[in-house]
């Protein structure tokens, strides 16, 4: 797994985990700002790394373990902010529960939490999602343009998604949904001295209802932040300055 680092001479550390169907450069706009102030670590997740097109996505658990191993190898014992979006939020949450490194603050942006449903139901959901994305992979840009509103996604953004869909494997698509829906979390999560935030856009409120309920039950100290006029995972590309300011506000607050 390739790990990209920026601003390594800075003191405060931020880890950014990208969502599915994009690459690590999803964070391009905020990286140009963050690297001037922070040491930023961005993994290129297996299956979504254009430099390693023969790799497949493994699992939420395995990636979290590999990231922990990398941090220990580089003698990083504390992370000031761990951010993950959607699939990346699943990995961030799993990493947080491992307690292998001190995470002072965590943001789960539209994070997918493990379904609390019977096994057969979760597999049916995974099959539905797999088929939907696979059809997009086959149909390419023309199908994406018909399926997504041009008011929310520009032509360039749709071309980017089509590019990613073109090189990722069907195995990666399947494992992404199967793992994000069913990764294993500890039954009891110990108290955390930092802050936990769950972000979601008002346009995805219904889709995130189960995830929000999960966080309320298993992480009762979570702060829920709803952003108006936003969909799923749209802040990094559409509102990078606002996103960076949210990061600063979270890290700089006195505990």
Regions found by a protein language model. Name each.
Residues 83-92:
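Gly/Ala-rich beta-loop-alpha elbow adjacent to hydrolase catalytic centers
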Residues 6-53:
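Conserved HGGG/HGGXW glycine-rich cap/lid loop of the alpha/beta-hydrolase fold
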Residues 41-83:
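Active-site loop/oxyanion-hole signature of alpha/beta-hydrolase fold enzymes
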Residues 202-207:
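Acidic catalytic loop of the alpha/beta-hydrolase fold
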Residues 192, 198-200:
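Short beta-strand/loop motif that positions the catalytic acidic residue
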Residues 97, 103-133:
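Flexible "cap/lid" loop of the alpha/beta hydrolase fold
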Residues 227-242:
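Catalytic histidine-centered segment of alpha/beta-hydrolase-like enzymes
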Residues 117-119, 137-190:
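Conserved alpha/beta-hydrolase catalytic His-Asp/Glu region
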